[in-house]
């Protein structure tokens, strides 16, 4: 229905952003809302309009490739929008594709809501079909090697990051296991989320 929406970010929350376009605020659910910043500068968000009998929602992504992976994940039995967002929010796109190609169920079950059955279904449905979502232009927006110019964060940023992790489906016990590492840092909300997801996916759960 919509290819993309352009506008400025009026609100950023744990689950979604509000993009103002010509005076209309679009609620757009994204993998990691905190990669966006409130600003009067116009941006473009690639969108996917999800419609079911009990829900109608707009999902947004920074690239077409990210959106394409989202739609492919939705095609897997057992994965809904929330699960697909959690996988994308990890920022480990290359690792996800590699795990599918290598039939690595142990890596895939680390994501919220993905059990062994769903992991096997992901491999069955997507193996050999993801080359078009990881071209050279598809950069890892969540790389630990990024260099940030923003000022360091505070406990407010950490609180926001924890809320975002809960919104993605991570349990309190999982969050609490990585919290000591996060408390050692002074980061922005986006950086806290990336750090936490990196720890969660590398076995510290």
Swiss-Prot record:
GO cellular component, one term: cytoplasm
Region (Domain II): 63-141
SMART domains: HhH1
Region (Domain I): 1-62
Region of interest (Domain III), residue spans: 153-205
Predominant subcellular localization, coarse grouping: cytoplasm
Molecular function terms from GO: ATP binding; four-way junction DNA binding; four-way junction helicase activity
Keyword DNA-binding: yes
Subcellular compartments: Cytoplasm
SUPFAM superfamilies found in the cross-reference section: DNA helicase RuvA subunit, C-terminal domain (SSF46929), Nucleic acid-binding proteins (SSF50249), RuvA domain 2-like (SSF47781)
The entry's keywords: Cytoplasm, DNA damage, DNA recombination, DNA repair, DNA-binding
A biological-process GO annotation: DNA recombination
Residue numbers spanned by region Flexible linker: 142-152
InterPro entries: DNA_helicase_Holl-junc_RuvA_I, Hlx-hairpin-Hlx_DNA-bd_motif, NA-bd_OB-fold, RuvA, RuvA_2-like, RuvA_C, RuvA_C_sf
Stretches that traverse the bilayer: none
Subunit structure: Homotetramer. Forms an RuvA(8)-RuvB(12)-Holliday junction (HJ) complex. HJ DNA is sandwiched between 2 RuvA tetramers; dsDNA enters through RuvA and exits via RuvB. An RuvB hexamer assembles on each DNA strand where it exits the tetramer. Each RuvB hexamer is contacted by two RuvA subunits (via domain III) on 2 adjacent RuvB subunits; this complex drives branch migration. In the full resolvosome a probable DNA-RuvA(4)-RuvB(12)-RuvC(2) complex forms which resolves the HJ.
Family, per entry: Belongs to the RuvA family.
Function per UniProt: The RuvA-RuvB-RuvC complex processes Holliday junction (HJ) DNA during genetic recombination and DNA repair, while the RuvA-RuvB complex plays an important role in the rescue of blocked DNA replication forks via replication fork reversal (RFR). RuvA specifically binds to HJ cruciform DNA, conferring on it an open structure. The RuvB hexamer acts as an ATP-dependent pump, pulling dsDNA into and through the RuvAB complex. HJ branch migration allows RuvC to scan DNA until it finds its consensus sequence, where it cleaves and resolves the cruciform DNA.
Xref: HAMAP family: DNA_HJ_migration_RuvA
Domain note: Has three domains with a flexible linker between the domains II and III and assumes an 'L' shape. Domain III is highly mobile and contacts RuvB.
Protein name from the UniProt record: Holliday junction branch migration complex subunit RuvA
Organism: Bacillus cytotoxicus (strain DSM 22905 / CIP 110041 / 391-98 / NVH 391-98)
């Amino acid at each position: 229905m919509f290819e993309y929406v352009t506008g400025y970010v009026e609100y950023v929350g744990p689950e979604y952003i509000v993009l103002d376009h010509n005076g209309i605020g679009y609620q757009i659910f994204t993998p990691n809302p905190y990669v966006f910043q409130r600003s009067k500068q116009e941006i473009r968000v690639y969108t996917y309009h999800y419609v079911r009998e009990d829900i109608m929602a707009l999902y947004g992504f920074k690239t077409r490739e990210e959106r394409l992976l989202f739609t492919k994940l939705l095609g897997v039995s057992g994965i809904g929008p929330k699960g697909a967002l959690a996988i994308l929010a990890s920022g480990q796109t290359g690792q996800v594709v590699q795990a599918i190609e290598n039939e690595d169920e142990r890596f895939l079950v680390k994501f919220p809501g993905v059990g062994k059955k769903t992991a096997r279904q992901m491999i069955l449905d997507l193996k050999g079909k993801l080359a078009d979502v990881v071209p050279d232009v598809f950069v890892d927006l969540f790389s630990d090697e990024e260099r940030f110019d923003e000022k360091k964060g505070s406990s407010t940023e950490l609180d926001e990051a924890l809320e975002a992790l809960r919104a993605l489906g991570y349990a309190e016990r999982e969050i609490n296991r990585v919290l000591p590492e996060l408390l050692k840092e002074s980061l922005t909300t986006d950086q806290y989320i990336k750090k936490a997801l990196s720890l969660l996916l590398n076995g510290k759960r």
